[in-house]
Amino acid sequence: KNGQPKPNFEPGLLLKAKVVVFAEGTRGSLFRQLSRKFDVWAGKNPEVFEEGVKEIIQCPPGTIEAGQVIHTLGFPLKESMGGTFIYTLPGDKVIVGLVAYLDSHDPLLDPHRELQKLKTHPFLQKMLKGGKVLAYGGKTLPAGGWYSMPKLYGQGWIVCGDSASMVDVQKLKGIHLAMRSGMCGAEMIFKGLVSQSSFDEATTKGYHDLVQASQIKSDLYRVRNFHQSLAKGFVASLPLLAAQEATGGRGFVDEMNSERDALTTEKAVEVWGPDPFSREENQLPKVDNQLFFDKLGSVYLTGTMHDEDSPNHLIVQDVDVCRTVCHPEFKSPCVVFCPASVYEMLPASKKPGQFDLQVNYTNCIHCKTCDIKCPFDNIEWTVPEGGGGPRYTET
């Protein structure tokens, strides 16, 4: 926990390869190191993300018809854009999820709270009557699309899937694109091995060319301005989306720019007034631990586990920023947007009227929102010791 090796410590292996495939999912830690060195986003839109949370709900026997797919937009979100999804499964189970845009200006955006509010809608109240939440999960997903894709190749490396922003955010689908990118990478690597290539850029560019000729481009190029349009708000986005639908994704402006999620957050008083936590929109529905949960109750359903004696993998660069600037002005967004109650601002014992940050890192479910959305870029998510994290089953 204090950075000292334990008796069973084993040093990591140094693996060497002719070519490395970065396929770490959203906000990959190794690829971030590489991207800093090679500036793979030069000339691109910055990465932008959405935070998704979902639950698996067991309903009474005979009440659910499997195979329904429902996507909605808007409710219950107010100051942020996003949507919801409802999928019905065999065995009278329902997946209910909510995805919120992290380039929101709202410092009190709380996807977990909004998911609980979603279940108060009369349609879902009827569908989920008598149901009980079995599992919960949360994760960020890259949303910038085609114009936020980094350089895909270099000397001895390529990047695939979510790490390369390969998600169709209109359909909330990315697994098929991740698989296709892996297949493109495998094809390039196989040809390189057969030809005994050194995997210089001339060789790894073959992966880029295969991606350009694949379903990846056709899917992502069609929705290349989708997220950027919706980020402007529901009403403002409607003519933009209509124009894009009529022009194969181009719309009125191509390409539409985006701003890093951390830079879009506004001060709490500017969004919610002098007493933001008293506003009705920021209240959690009554908890019953059956259908409605607080965050700690939901975290239990993830099965997340970390060794209590392991080092904190959530690195806060400057806790004074949290105390003196972020909490007074922004009301500590990390406390709110984290779907797992990792961050708390507790009264400072020796400084009346001030608050200190406490990091409950063993609660972490590895969504990486804190690394993305902190308005001061003050938190870095690092890989935890020994494979700790959520024990997802159906989620």
Where are these regions (language model features)?
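Predominantly flavin-linked oxidoreductase catalytic cores and closely associated redox partners
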Residues: K1-K126, S165, S181-C184, M188
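Alpha-helix N-cap/helix-initiation motif
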Residues: K6, E10, A42, Q170-A178, ...
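Alpha-helix capping and helix-loop boundary segments enriched in small/acidic/polar residues
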Residues: K44, D106-L109, S148-K151, V169-L177, ...
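FAD-binding beta-loop-beta segment adjacent to the flavin cofactor pocket
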Residues: G138-V169, G297-P311, C322-F337, E344
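Extended, hydrophobic alpha-helical segments in both membrane/secreted and soluble proteins
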Residues: Y153, V159-D168, I175-I189, T203, ...
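Active-site-proximal substrate-binding core of FAD-dependent oxidoreductases
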Residues: S165-K171, M183, E187-V235, K351-G353, ...
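C-terminal auxiliary extensions adjacent to catalytic cores
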Residues: L230-N289
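Iron-sulfur cluster-binding cysteine motifs and their immediate structural context
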Residues: P328-T362, T369-R391
